[in-house]
């Protein structure tokens, strides 16, 4: 029977900052409720949500599950499916798309595509990301799945896969003059935004203030003014209609921490921008992303193995911690005194539990570095004889 030793180390340390995503290495995200979020911070909007992107930790919420019309913030999901289509090879960035009459007929924000006009997927993405062009969004949707109707079915399927419990899409643009159930929530917008900003192309274009298409003849200006005026802002999407009010998913990164601030239903563009700035300011002022890299630990003895011990290492760890409290972080190592062979390389043999005060803020796995088979009977017998005489 394996005996586990819990070693409590109370450390005063500064975590090494890193932007490497650690979920693939066995790091468990911060436990819900382990952070103290402000009940005093208020927003002038129908709903709001603040998330840290790497851990998915909620830093602020207000009416976050209430369903409202998102206007052009809808295009976060539209663009996510396009990025996934590029990633899978279903479409190519250099594909030339012939604009349909339906795509060219889109009103609202647009780049005035004409029926029969040819434009590359990359340029259509730029138009959608930077200028929030409805005609470009529809052209992309038709290119990937043949029709907007089929594309919307895929949007709703993807929303379900992501756990967006309060979302239903009726089109790819967010135009809501004739929609009856095209709704989502601030939390769901943050969830799909978190997925979208994983893509380099999105981060590249959503952080630009201006770009151009048609050989420089048509200037694209970002609908997100925070890109120009807010330090660290790198996206993401704005939207407004009479029904939706003024909405935004604003992303910004400082000191290695990527925040997503969602505002829904503000009364004016200026109010929306101010509330998004205020929410981002709150996040950067009160929280920080700290991390520990992958690191080697002491060897663990192996019983009945072809090798007497295995080196072990702990996976990287990331957590959001309230500023000023890092000195209170404790680490509990749960490591077996010994392990019976066979064991496999990267086999989990223990874990590190991280605590801040009484709250568990996360844990990371401890793995074996070696692949050790069970020793043969002859080798075991030889080891016994050797131990008797030496």
Question: What are these model-derived regions, one by one?
Answer:
Residues 15-16, 88, 291-294:
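Residues in and immediately flanking transmembrane alpha helices
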Residues 21-200:
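Active-site-adjacent loops and short helices of periplasmic peptidoglycan-processing enzymes
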Residues 3-4, 76, 254:
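Hydrophobic alpha-helical segments, especially transmembrane helices
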Residues 1-2, 70, 121, 377, ...:
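Structural motif marking the loop-to-transmembrane transition
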């Amino acid at each position: 029977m394996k005996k586990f030793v819990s070693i409590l180390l109370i450390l005063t340390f500064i975590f090494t900052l890193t932007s490497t995503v650690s979920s693939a290495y066995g790091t468990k995200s911060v436990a819900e409720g382990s952070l103290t979020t402000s009940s005093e911070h208020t927003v002038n909007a129908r709903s709001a949500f603040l998330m840290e992107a790497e851990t998915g930790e909620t830093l602020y919420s207000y009416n976050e599950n209430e369903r409202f019309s998102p206007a052009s913030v809808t295009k976060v999901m539209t663009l996510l499916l396009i990025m996934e289509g590029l990633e899978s090879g279903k479409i190519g960035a250099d594909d030339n798309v012939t604009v349909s009459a339906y795509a060219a007929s889109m009103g609202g924000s647009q780049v005035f595509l004409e029926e029969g006009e040819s434009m590359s997927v990359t340029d259509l993405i730029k138009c959608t990301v930077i200028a929030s062009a409805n005609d470009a969004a529809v052209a992309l949707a038709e290119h990937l799945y043949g029709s907007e109707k089929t594309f919307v079915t895929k949007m709703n399927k993807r929303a379900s896969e992501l756990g967006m419990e309060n979302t239903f899409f009726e089109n790819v643009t967010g135009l809501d003059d004739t929609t009856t159930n095209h709704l989502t929530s601030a939390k769901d917008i943050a969830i799909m935004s978190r997925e979208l900003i994983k893509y380099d192309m999105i981060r590249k274009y959503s952080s630009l203030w201006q770009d151009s298409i048609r050989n420089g003849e048509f200037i694209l200006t970002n609908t997100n003014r925070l890109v120009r005026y807010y330090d660290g802002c790198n996206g993401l999407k704005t939207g407004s209609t009479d029904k939706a009010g003024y909405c935004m998913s604003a992303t910004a990164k400082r000191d290695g921490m990527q925040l997503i601030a969602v505002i829904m239903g503000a009364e004016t563009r200026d109010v929306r921008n101010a509330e998004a700035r205020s929410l981002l300011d709150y996040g950067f002022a009160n929280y920080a992303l700290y991390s520990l890299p992958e690191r080697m630990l002491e060897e663990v003895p192996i019983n009945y193995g072809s090798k007497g011990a295995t080196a072990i290492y702990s996976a990287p760890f990331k957590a959001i911690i309230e500023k000023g409290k890092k000195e209170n972080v404790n680490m509990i190592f749960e490591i077996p005194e010994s392990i019976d062979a066979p064991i496999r390389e990267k086999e989990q043999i223990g874990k590190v539990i991280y605590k801040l005060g009484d709250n568990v803020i996360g844990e990371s796995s401890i793995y074996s570095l070696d692949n050790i088979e069970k020793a043969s009977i002859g080798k075991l017998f030889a080891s016994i004889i050797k131990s008797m005489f030496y």
